[in-house]
């Protein structure tokens, strides 16, 4: 069977995602990654084993398992939606598994040295509207553990000054949830709003020439953080701030995963368990190193 899909479908393949019940950012990511699968189909044709063979094709690449799975998942979502819409007669993804991926984080969060460099740099900044903006952003990342996308989604109205909390639109959530703010976060946000005269709409707006005045994007925020990290010789990603936040809570509340989850807003305790295990491994490693401190050659 050489063709289960009319050739016209692939000319406008992005339209298949229009009726998916997903966030727009997810839809954009799907459309970004799908052309690789489309090129594969155009080259090798489409039959009941295409998805399985595509997985074998991805396995032969030098990409990480995480990247391979991202491409495989997009192809799976695409094919399942094609089947749901009646564009192909069968679900060719059935019984084809994803690549097995370790649940442990490959990248570490900011460590104590990184935090010292960053906080000293922030504390030495002069009092300007731009610097107040940076301090407000980092207070939400370091002290509240917000994800980048959550920071970018915030509106001025989400800051409940009276009760000192934020209403955060979390990852994979349909409604905003209240997040209690630490005193320093409240102070930083108040100062930022006052000095920048932000009254309504997006809490953080872009200062770049092409996006001036528009809501700060996740990509834009990641770039801001990356530039600062590079300047301070912090070899970590922007998401490392959330890793730091979660690890710090677990260090001070060891084993209290349910309590920690209330603040990190992880939907899965399993993910927190991975963080907790990493902390325990680091603690044990220090003991192992000290055990062999007298052995040298």
Q: Where is each model-derived feature located?
A:
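N-terminal core-binding DNA-recognition domain of tyrosine recombinases/integrases
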Residues: 10-106, 124
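Active-site/catalytic core of tyrosine-dependent DNA strand-transfer enzymes
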Residues: 182-234
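Conserved tyrosine-mediated DNA breakage-rejoining catalytic core shared by Y-recombinases
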Residues: 144, 153-188
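A short, basic/aromatic helix-end/turn motif that makes direct DNA contacts
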Residues: 153-159, 261-268, 276-278
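Flexible interdomain linker/hinge and immediately adjacent N-terminus
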Residues: 88-119, 169, 207-212
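C-terminal catalytic core of tyrosine-transesterase DNA break-rejoin enzymes
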Residues: 139, 143, 242-267, 273, ...
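DNA/chromatin major-groove-contacting recognition/catalytic segments
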Residues: 179-180, 262, 274-297
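Basic, Lys/Arg- and aromatic-enriched nucleic-acid-binding interface segment
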Residues: 117-148
């Amino acid at each position: 069977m050489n063709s289960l899909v009319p050739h016209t479908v692939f000319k406008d393949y992005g339209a298949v995602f229009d009726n998916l019940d997903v966030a727009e950012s997810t839809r954009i990511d799907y459309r970004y990654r799908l052309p690789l699968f489309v090129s594969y189909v155009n080259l090798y044709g489409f039959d009941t084993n295409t998805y399985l063979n595509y997985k074998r094709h991805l396995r032969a690449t030098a990409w990480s398992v995480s990247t391979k799975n991202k491409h495989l998942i997009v192809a799976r979502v695409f094919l399942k939606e094609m089947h749901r819409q009646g564009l192909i007669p069968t679900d060719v993804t059935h019984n084809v598994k994803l690549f097995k991926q370790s649940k442990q984080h490959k990248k570490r969060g900011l460590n104590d040295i990184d935090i010292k460099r960053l906080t000293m740099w922030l504390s030495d900044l002069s009092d300007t509207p731009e610097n107040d903006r940076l301090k407000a952003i980092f207070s939400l990342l370091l002290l509240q553990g917000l994800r980048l996308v959550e920071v970018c989604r915030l509106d001025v109205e989400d800051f409940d000054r009276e009760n000192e909390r934020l209403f955060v639109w979390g990852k994979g959530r349909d409604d905003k949830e209240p997040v209690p703010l630490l005193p320093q976060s409240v102070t930083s946000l108040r100062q930022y709003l006052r000095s920048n005269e932000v009254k309504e709409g997006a809490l953080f707006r872009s200062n770049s020439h092409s996006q001036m005045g528009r809501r700060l994007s996740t990509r834009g925020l990641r770039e801001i953080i990356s530039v600062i990290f590079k300047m301070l010789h912090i070899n970590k990603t922007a998401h490392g701030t959330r890793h730091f936040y979660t690890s710090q809570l677990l260090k001070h509340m060891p084993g209290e995963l349910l309590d920690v989850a209330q603040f990190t807003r992880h939907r899965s305790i399993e993910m927190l368990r991975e963080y907790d295990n990493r902390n325990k491994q680091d603690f044990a490693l220090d003991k192992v190193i000290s055990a062999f401190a007298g052995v040298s050659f």
